[in-house]
Amino acid sequence: MKFEESMELPVIVVDSGVLLPGASLKIPIRSKLNTRTIEQHLTRGGSNYVVIAYKLSTDKIYNVATIAYIEKLFGWTFNSTTNYSLDVIGLHRANIDKLSFPKCRVSKLEDSSERAEFNHSTIENVISGAKILAQNSESLKFSQEIHNSIDDHDYGKLADLCVSQIKNLEFSQFLDFLGTKNVEKRLEMCEKWMQMQRETKALQLKMAVPGNSEIPKKINKQRIPNSKNQVEQLEEKLSAIEFSEEVSDRVFSELHRLKNMNPQQSEYTVLMNWLELVSNLPWNTSTVDDIEINKARKILEDSHESMDDVKQRVLEHLAVCKINNSVKGMILCFTGPPGIGKTSIAKAIAESMGRKFQRVSLGGIRDESDIRGHRRTYVAAMPGRIIEALKHCKSNNPVFLLDEVDKLYSGNQGSPSAALLELLDPEQNSTFHDHYLNIPFDVSKIMFIATANDVERLEPALKDRLEIIEMSGYSMKEKVKICENHLVNRQLSKHCISPDYVNLDRHAIMAMIEEFTMEAGVRQLERNVGAVCRHVALRLAEALNSDPSADVLPDMDLPIQIGEPDIHKILKAKHMKRVKIVEKMRPLPPGVCFGLSVTTNGGRVMPIEASKCKGTGKIVTTGHLGKVLEESILVAKGWLGANAEKLGLKTLEENDIHVHLPAGAVNKDGPSAGTGLACALVSLAMGVPLRSDAAVTGEISLTGHVLAIGGVKEKVLAAQREGLRRVVLPKSNEEEYLKIDEDIRNEMDVVLADTVEDVIEAMMEKEPVLAKL
């Protein structure tokens, strides 16, 4: 904007703080007069320039004002009142010619003085002080303005900039300086005030030297030497690290900045923290791989029961790593219900390779910055979880477990899943960029392993980078072995009880599994074992209290025998005994069938109930059913309607049908309930109950074909846990069924069906009554 000799501009009146040309000022708007000026002339696309006028203690307006540029205008509402704040930059001195709120007419004031009149000693003192201010300033813009003023010999502007940084002046002194047109006088005032400020700081430092007081002495001993030593130690650590050329240039450039910086500047601490992080990262520190396949096989066998397919895939992965001497390739992702050993498998892999193990929990993360860190410009910025974990690990090639990757959520702060893509891509992760670190760090030597409960919740791009290894739940036999070989010893050690003091028999373990757990894994089972150990610990403590000086436990038969009756006494008070839904619903009435489903917690038996009443053929569904499940009901009813005559059944078109799946608070969806729904409707139409010891799963087509489903092992194990002995599966799932342990297959009566008629025959209580269509 070109300023004329006289102009009219909006006016803001302040009674504290003086804006000098070249300086900046934040002005909170409190008075109604200033608020009106803003609302009438500044908030509606008005002028970007304003006059800052100054009110004296006599309520008069000082005759000299400042023409300012509005850099930012803030507005917010609090208690139904709109508040404003201005960020302004001083441009020129101005004389107030006429004041008529909310505007005033001003004329620009020019500096008066010839350079020849300046006192060279005064100029040198001001320039010297100005350079110190520029060096200590946190504002690059201010430092640049100082140097430009010195280069251009603009001493009036230089004096204004220097005085704007002096904090201990009175309001009236600032106004006197603002009203002084003569540059030489302003330089003298500036020199005088800067000298006063230096003397004040010197006095403060003198008070802090050793001997004046105990507290400054401690500060002097602890802080002042350590500040210098800390930088020297930091330089030694950084010099010992072999950086790449790009990283080295950046790190030592920042170290040079730190050395030339005043420790009292706020950026000093930020830069120091950044350099300390760089020095603590494992740039060149690695562990030597010690991959022996036989040793790895033994570690996996000793630490985990069954899971032969998973162990085989892990050994194959380790074999490739040994041959290639590299871990680049597919990233393993173990998926399955909680408590089945996904994390412990990753620990076993680290042990078998001789590498350090580092776990990062990703559950519930919504902010990309949790993965990649915050930029250093933010207050309280910190590195992301990956870099932070590497700092604690002190190795650049650990086995890195990304736990619960399916629990990542996208939000307004970005997508954490997308942030993992660079980390897990072998073509990019040699130059991984954390926002806080802001220099490339090589994470390509890390072996990444992920875990998830529900693989369907993974982002497609992230899922594409992972090799999914499914881990199923455990059978009763496997749980008993795990409990005997691992859980009991672990809990006894945790509770400091000698194995010689207690004997937990197999029937007690089976009772804990059957009656007090309902899970695919063994997490709740371990809690139950812990409860038994606490009961034993109490009995031992009570015996010791009777004779504390005894070398042996008095009046006690050891080991303490824990049988099935003891389990009921110990756990009944602590855990509600599990009631099997199968037992509760027997005997089954017509229209009721046991289906099977899979959740993130493993397989479960899902009762299906159907009832009818006179009506018009309407279908009512309850139980929090999803769209796919509701369509399966329509398919089952459509098949029954099309084949009712051939089956010799009365049509259900004259009845309203109500289909309900219990546990109404739980979402249910998926196509695998099709065969169960068809069986329930046929049973309802015939008035004949289905077998109460059988469960069924499978998708059906409208033409009566039974289609393949997923989660075969989980569903068979769920039926086994509930005491069901017959399971009807689709014929097309035979291959998955044969992968189940032979012991389980021998216990269960599994029928493989091709058509809906095969399913109904297998599910009938008595001999089949249906003829083949």
UniProtKB/Swiss-Prot annotation:
Keywords: ATP-binding, Hydrolase, Nucleotide-binding, Peroxisome, Protease, Serine protease
Any one GO CC term of the record: peroxisomal matrix
Keyword Protease included in the entry's annotation: yes
Motif stretch (Microbody targeting signal): 771-773
GO molecular function terms noted in the UniProt entry: ATP binding; ATP hydrolysis activity; ATP-dependent peptidase activity; serine-type endopeptidase activity
Domain Lon proteolytic: 587-766
A matching Pfam family: LON_substr_bdg
Function: ATP-dependent serine protease that mediates the selective degradation of misfolded and unassembled polypeptides in the peroxisomal matrix. Necessary for type 2 peroxisome targeting signal (PTS2)-containing protein processing and facilitates peroxisome matrix protein import.
The protein, known as: Lon protease homolog 2, peroxisomal
Protein species of origin: Caenorhabditis briggsae
